[in-house]
């Protein structure tokens, strides 16, 4: 009984194995894109695929290899551009062509490498800019007098 309980509560190791399996599956899909002639002229394709894989894994909350509505909601809120339920459904429909309610990794990479513009394509750009922006000031704010107030 105690062995059974300890296996059930071994979340860290199980989660690590789950993420490793997911990363292997996504790496297989990356290899398909690297071998595809359609993307042979894409600059820095291996680096882009690595970045896409990291972002996809970060927002795949249910670890099923798909970004669902709630994962997309979290992604948009993290970017500071919260969307309504209907807007997010429309985004998913645009990316998947209306075939699915979730965004698969293939759909995600096709969208990121594709020529058409989508809101999700901004994710990588905004997160990159957010990380590169100047650091926030530390310490107490400077003193102000009455004349400087609006």
Swiss-Prot record:
The identity of this protein, by name, is Allograft inflammatory factor 1-like
The protein's matches in PANTHER family, at most eight in alphabetical order, are given as: ALLOGRAFT INFLAMMATORY FACTOR 1-LIKE, ALLOGRAFT INFLAMMATORY FACTOR-1
Q: Does the keyword Transcription apply?
A: no
Q: What is its main location?
A: cytoplasm
Q: Which organism is it from?
A: Pongo abelii
Q: Which gene encodes it?
A: AIF1L
N-acetylserine PTM positions: 2
Cite the entry's keywords alphabetically: Acetylation, Actin-binding, Calcium, Cell membrane, Cell projection, Cytoplasm, Cytoskeleton, Membrane, Metal-binding, Phosphoprotein, Repeat
Transcription regulation as UniProt keyword: no
Which InterPro entries would you find in this protein's record? Answer: AIF-1_EF_pair, AIF1/AIF1L, EF-hand-dom_pair, EF_hand_dom
> What is the annotated localization of this protein?
Cytoplasm, Cytoskeleton; Cell projection, Ruffle membrane
Top-level lineage group: Eukaryota
Task: Please give the function described in this protein's UniProt entry.
Answer: Actin-binding protein that promotes actin bundling. May neither bind calcium nor depend on calcium for function.
């Amino acid at each position: 009984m105690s062995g059974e309980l300890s296996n059930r509560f071994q979340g860290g190791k199980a989660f690590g194995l789950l993420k490793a399996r997911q990363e292997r599956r996504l790496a297989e899909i990356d290899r398909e894109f690297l071998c595809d002639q359609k993307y042979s002229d894409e600059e820095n394709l291996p680096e882009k695929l690595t970045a896409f894989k990291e972002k996809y894994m970060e927002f795949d909350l249910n670890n099923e290899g798909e970004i669902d509505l709630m994962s997309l909601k979290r992604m948009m809120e993290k970017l500071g551009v919260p969307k309504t339920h209907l807007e997010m459904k429309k985004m998913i429909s645009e990316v998947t062509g209306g075939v699915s309610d979730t965004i698969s990794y293939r759909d995600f990479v096709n969208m990121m490498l594709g020529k058409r513009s989508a809101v999700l394509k901004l994710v990588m750009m905004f997160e990159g800019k957010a990380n590169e922006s100047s650091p926030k000031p530390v310490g107490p704010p400077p003193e102000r007098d009455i004349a400087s107030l609006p």
